[in-house]
Amino acid sequence: MADMKRLKHLMFSPFIDNNPIALQVLGICSALAVTTKLQTAIVMGISVALVTGFSSFFISLVRNYIPNSIRIIVQMAIIASLVTLVDQLLQAFAYELSKQLSVFVGLIITNCIVMGRAEAFAMKEPPLESLIDGIGNGAGYGIMLLVVATVRELIGSGKLLGYTVFQTVQDGGWYQTNGLFLLAPSAFFIIGFLIWGLRTWKPEQAEE
């Protein structure tokens, strides 16, 4: 039976202590693309968490039967199958969101977080631990997306999840929107400030 303390560590350490974006600087490309709106960031975060968790689980199940020479191909086949399933489900039940996310759901297969957990963890550890580790890392990625998307949508349009938070000047209110935050470069700066803030709060995360 898996140790509960270890499972909790695997699940929650990627949230702050070992965040895949803030500490490992992985998955940056999609973080720039899907964080203009909080809704797309939520869906992308959930998608990555599920794909990372279940791909790690299935890879761990068959890890002892995969020849070393083709392990990357097998990992990518499993990940691609799950990504295709997620993409089809989004198209079936959330078509508008699927169109907004465009190719970025399909590109989860190339996300370094998914491949990294499969290669570094799932190939060495039991299925349950691999599942928890994958979901934890996907959730850590999703948390960063949520923070970035909240800042970008709120400052860029005065809205969150499509609901008005700050009444804009155009609608007779006081808030002047800042279109810069709806452009990709703003995500770089926000992520940079988040990394700086985390490493100031936790100096042990700073690189030597």
Swiss-Prot record:
It is found in: Cell inner membrane. It catalyses: a ubiquinone + n Na(+)(in) + NADH + H(+) = a ubiquinol + n Na(+)(out) + NAD(+). Keywords: Cell inner membrane, Cell membrane, Ion transport, Membrane, NAD, Sodium, Sodium transport, Translocase, Transmembrane, Transmembrane helix, Transport, Ubiquinone. Pfam families: Rnf-Nqr (PF02508). Its main location: membrane. Composed of six subunits; NqrA, NqrB, NqrC, NqrD, NqrE and NqrF. This is Na(+)-translocating NADH-quinone reductase subunit D. The lineage of its organism: Bacteria, Pseudomonadati, Pseudomonadota, Betaproteobacteria, Neisseriales.
